[in-house]
Amino acid sequence: MALRFEILHQSKKSRARVGRIETEHGCIDTPAFVPVATNGALKGVLDHSNIPLMFCNTYHLIVHPGAEAVAAMGGLHQFIGRNAPIITDSGGFQIFSLAYGSVAEEIKSCGKKKGENSIIKINDEGVWFKSYRDGRKLFLSPEVSVQAQKHLGADIIIPLDELLPFHTDPAYFQQSSQRTYAWEKRSLDYHLANPGYQSMYGVIHGGTFPDQRKLGCQFVEDLPFDGSAIGGSLGKNLRDIVGVVDVTTANLSIERPRHLLGIGDLPSIWATVGFGIDSFDSSYPTKAARHGMILTSQGSLKINNQRYASDLNPIEPGCACPACSQGISRAYLRHLFKVHEPNAGIWASIHNMHYMQKIMSKIREKILNDQL
């Protein structure tokens, strides 16, 4: 079945809402944090059964083991042992972010350009690029991308689009926007020829230009997408992100779920959830964990700091995650990081992922009580 979305409560204080997305492989309570499992695995997290929705990257799975190989093994759910919802992207994000830098990197660097060595050629047909793994020449078109996502079998899929960096000149911006929306229409047409249980979100572009964002909303709203995803360049700082999300959500109907692509750090979630965003994807908690950044209700702990060398408190007192429940202390976790023990990143990732789920539960409760 295609997804069903129900709004359970609309906040009286903001545009925030609590909802539920039903898919073939289970339900997602929203707003939800969606961790990124790049190669079909959450780095440092072995048990993802309590994660309501997981984001897998089509580009990396095309490169290895191959989308057809995954299909031959029963699809992504069976391949990775997950009986819960999965969302995949088109593959375009990785291709263009390898050339231009990711959205998060763009925000940090104000769009300083990276090399474009990975992209060989781009035109209206699609994009030719080199595999980061072995240098093979690969091709991705709307139809190729959607077929790959059909092979993978995710519950929610994304049409092919072109990710532009912040520094793009206006002339190419217009050309790219037209190409992106043509690609999205082709993606949707290919999907609808054999939708099965899968659903597709339309991606809204427009950079930081309100008029272009409104046009993007109109494009997605006029087509039978199952949900909306806010993508493209979101600016150079949190203020820009908030502005883009505000104007975009104000021009979307309330009936479809809304996803914010590539943004899922805590400051951004708190700043944008009030505009009616239903899901956020990011590798933020596991990446932070691998660098010794521990998320807690008292703020982030830089566990490598000397102050934790003799701290026998749990990572976070009162936390029910497996790491804290088993008595992993701050001093012990710091020791593991200092000696480069792989378990350090595992325990930290388990805690951070649990913390993110706890925060989303808190956010849903605040919305239900009209406090957010």
Swiss-Prot record:
Catalytic activity: 7-aminomethyl-7-carbaguanine + guanosine(34) in tRNA = 7-aminomethyl-7-carbaguanosine(34) in tRNA + guanine
Single Gene Ontology MF annotation: tRNA-guanosine(34) queuine transglycosylase activity
GO biological process: queuosine biosynthetic process; tRNA-guanine transglycosylation
Binding site for Zn(2+): C319, C321, C324, H351
Pathway: tRNA modification; tRNA-queuosine biosynthesis
UniProt entry keywords in alphabetical sequence: Glycosyltransferase, Metal-binding, Queuosine biosynthesis, Transferase, tRNA processing, Zinc
Pfam families cross-referenced by the UniProt entry: TGT
Function: Catalyzes the base-exchange of a guanine (G) residue with the queuine precursor 7-aminomethyl-7-deazaguanine (PreQ1) at position 34 (anticodon wobble position) in tRNAs with GU(N) anticodons (tRNA-Asp, -Asn, -His and -Tyr). Catalysis occurs through a double-displacement mechanism. The nucleophile active site attacks the C1' of nucleotide 34 to detach the guanine base from the RNA, forming a covalent enzyme-RNA intermediate. The proton acceptor active site deprotonates the incoming PreQ1, allowing a nucleophilic attack on the C1' of the ribose to form the product.
Family statement: Belongs to the queuine tRNA-ribosyltransferase family.
Name of this chain's protein: Queuine tRNA-ribosyltransferase
Record organism: Chlamydia muridarum (strain MoPn / Nigg)
